C-alpha cells in the first residue's frame, strides 16, 4: 500500500474508533479469554468471554466479545491470552477468525485438531496474519468443541477506505454492528446433546420467555441519516428472520463480498453468515422494534423476546408499539457479486476438475451425523501437524474417511444434498469463498451470477442439492462443516487437504502448543461436571 493510502486507511480506522462506543482492539492487541458472570437476559451464569481487559467487575449485562477492527491491507497481530479457570466449562481454547482466507498462514486459522492444538490456561498464542485483499464483515469464535456456545464469540470488521458502496451511507462504525446470538442457561459440557436456546441476544442483550423484563439493546439513529448496519449471526444453532419495523433494508454485502444493492424488508440469516444493509432513517421520530425470530426455541415476540429497539433521536425511552409487516424477503439467488461475478469452470453441472458429492446422514444407533458414512472425530494430532510430519494423502491422514485431498489450481464442485434431520444445515468452508451455483429451494444452476459467500444453507427439501464451486489456490487443511455447533460436535464435517506440499511452516510458538496441551490433566482441560 502506498504511503498516502496508508495514511487514509489509518485516519479511516481512527474515525471508526472515535465514533464507536464499544471497546475495540486491532489490528494489533491483546485478547483476554476469561470466565465472567454474565446476565444478558436476566439469568446469571458463568460464561467464557473475550475482553480487551482481563479484570472483571461484578456481573456483566452483556455477552458479546471485544470488537476487533482494522483496515484492508492490515497485518493483524492478535495475542490471545487464556485465563480460564472455571472447570465446569472448557479451560483450553482456540480462536477461528471467520471468513479470512489465511493465505500463507493456515496455522492461524484456529480450528482445534485441524489447524492447531488448543491453548492451555495460563498460556498465550499470537495469531499473526495478513489481510491484503479482503474487507467487510467478519467475526471470531472459539473453534474448540462447543465452547463458543458458552459465549466466546465477537465481531471482526475490516474497513475499506475505497469501499465501492461508500456513497450509499453516512454512518458506519462500531455502533452500527448488530450481532445475533442464541444463549443457554446451562453450560455447554453439561447441556443436552442437542439443546434448545433459552433466549436470543441482540448486541449481547435479550429476554427469555417467562423471565424478567431485562434491558434490551438500543440502537440510536438520527433522522435522515443513512446507516450501514453490519448484521452478524454468531448463532450456535438457530437461524433468524431479521427485520426492523417500518424500514426497508438495502443489502450491499454478504459474507464480506460486495453485492449489487438489493432492497428487502426481511433477511433469513444462518449461523456464521453476515450481511451489510443500508437503513435510511427517514421515518417518524419514534421507537421501532428490531426483530430476530429464531426457527427453534421460543419464537415470536411476546414480552420483548427476540427483540431490540431502533430509537430515533428525540423519541421517548419507551418500548416500541410498532407492528411488523414484511413482504420482500432476501433470496440468496438474488445476491449478485459486484466484482468479477461468475463461477469458475465449464457452465455445466459436474463439469469441474474435481466433483465431490457429500451425502449427510443421521446415524441413530451411535447418535452421530455423518458425511459419506463417516462422522468427523477430532484426531489427537492436528491435521496440519500430520501434514508437516509427512502424511500427505487422504489415506494417510486422520480422521479416516473425513479427509479429502485436493490438487492445486483445480476447479472443485461440491454438491450437498439436503438432510431434513436437524436441518437446514448451514455449511462453512474455511480458507475460501465459493460460488453457489445451486441454492436451497432452487433447481436452477446459475454459473453467470451466482451468490458468492462462505456459509451456505443446504435446505431441507428432498429435492434440494446445494452446489458450490471454488478454485484450489490456497494451500492448507481447510475445514468444511455445519455451523450448527452441536452438529459439528457429533460429526458433521470434513477436511480438505489442499495442495499440501506448498504449505508454509508455522512459527515456533505453534510447535509448542501440542506438547503443552498433551501434558494437561483432565482437570486442566475443563468441562467437568
Curated annotation (Swiss-Prot):
One GO molecular function term? copper ion binding
Q: Where in the cell is it found?
A: Secreted
Q: Say if the entry is tagged with keyword Secreted.
A: yes
Which reaction equations make up its catalytic activity?
4 hydroquinone + O2 = 4 benzosemiquinone + 2 H2O
Give the E.C. number(s). Answer: 1.10.3.2
PANTHER family in UniProt: LACCASE (PTHR11709:SF511), MULTI-COPPER OXIDASE (PTHR11709)
Q: What is this protein called?
A: Laccase-1
Species assigned in the record: Pleurotus ostreatus (Oyster mushroom)
Task: Give the source lineage, highest ranks first.
Answer: Eukaryota, Fungi, Dikarya, Basidiomycota, Agaricomycotina
